[in-house]
């Protein structure tokens, strides 16, 4: 199975797999059962911003999700990613729908990673930024139902021609280039990711959520991972 570290913006509480009984932000380390969660006041039809950061000195992974004009939600978890992830990874966004559904629209996405070694400052820095997404993106690997639309948005899950979200959908977008996330000689390894998103739903209970994830470079969508597994894990263990 893939090695996955993820931040989930989980819109639907699947209490049978350990979710709290409300929409939440969670940090997932190699399992859909989050290590840390915080209640998320999800606002459908409004653009939100998610910011994820990590550095190897504090060994803390933090996510902040906010909507303009309202308070933000923060979740963090202390973890040494050197012990979890391979040295080279890919970073991506995933989303799913299930019985209930929602649009999982990404409007922008940026990422910066830095490795500081004693010898050369920032010798290994990687940065990318999408303010809009082209129709046939050369710099993204689209998996499952993920597509880019004529408005320059990334639709992670299936929408009809009229823009209505479809159920039982799973899609992911990964940056094409592998990222050197850590190395043994690095003094500091850090990364920051930011994406803006829009979730809309005709259902009173939208589902299932969006994630930012880091995985081994040959990662693929596990079969049967739509709905509560958020396109990341083959099972709920």
From Swiss-Prot:
Signal peptide: none annotated. A carbohydrate binds at residues 12, 99-100, 228. Pfam families: Lectin_legB. Ca(2+) binds at residues 10, 12, 14, 19, 208. It comes from the Eukaryota. Mn(2+) binds at residues 8, 10, 19, 24, 34. Keywords: Calcium, Lectin, Manganese, Mannose-binding, Metal-binding. InterPro entries: ConA-like_dom_sf, Lectin_LegA_CS, Lectin_legB_Mn/Ca_BS, Legume_lectin_dom, Leguminous_Lectin. Disulfide bonds: none annotated. One of its GO terms (molecular function) is metal ion binding. Gene3D superfamilies: 2.60.120.200. The beta and gamma chains are produced by partial proteolytic processing of the lectin alpha chain by an asparaginyl endopeptidase. Binds one manganese (or another transition metal) ion and one calcium ion. The metal ions are essential for the saccharide-binding and cell-agglutinating activities. Belongs to the leguminous lectin family. PANTHER family: CONCANAVALIN A-LIKE LECTIN FAMILY PROTEIN, LEGUME LECTIN DOMAIN-CONTAINING PROTEIN. D-mannose/D-glucose-binding lectin. Also binds derivatives of glucose and mannose such as more complex glycans. Homotetramer. This is Mannose-specific lectin alpha chain.
């Amino acid at each position: 199975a893939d090695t996955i570290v993820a931040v989930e913006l989980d819109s639907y509480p699947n209490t049978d797999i350990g979710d709290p009984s409300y929409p939440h932000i969670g940090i997932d380390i190699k399992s859909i059962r989050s290590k840390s969660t915080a209640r998320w006041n999800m606002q459908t039809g409004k653009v939100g911003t998610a910011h994820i950061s990590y550095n190897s000195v504090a060994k803390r992974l933090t996510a902040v999700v906010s909507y303009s004009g309202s308070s933000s939600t923060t979740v963090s978890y202390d973890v040494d990613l050197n012990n979890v992830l391979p040295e080279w990874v890919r970073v991506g966004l995933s989303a799913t729908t299930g019985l209930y559904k929602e649009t999982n629209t990404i409007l922008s996405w940026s990422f910066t990673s830095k490795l500081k070694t004693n010898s050369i400052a920032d010798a290994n820095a990687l940065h990318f930024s999408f303010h809009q997404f082209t129709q046939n993106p050369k710099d993204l690997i689209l998996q499952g139902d993920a597509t880019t639309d004529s408005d320059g948005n990334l639709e992670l899950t299936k929408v009809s021609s009229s823009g209505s979200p479809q159920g039982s959908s799973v899609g992911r977008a990964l940056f094409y280039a592998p990222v050197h996330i850590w190395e043994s000689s690095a003094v500091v390894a850090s990364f920051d990711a930011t994406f803006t998103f829009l979730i809309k739903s005709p259902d009173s209970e939208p589902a299932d959520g969006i994630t930012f994830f880091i995985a081994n470079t040959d990662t693929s969508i596990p079969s049967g991972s739509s709905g509560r597994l958020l396109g990341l894990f083959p099972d709920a263990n």
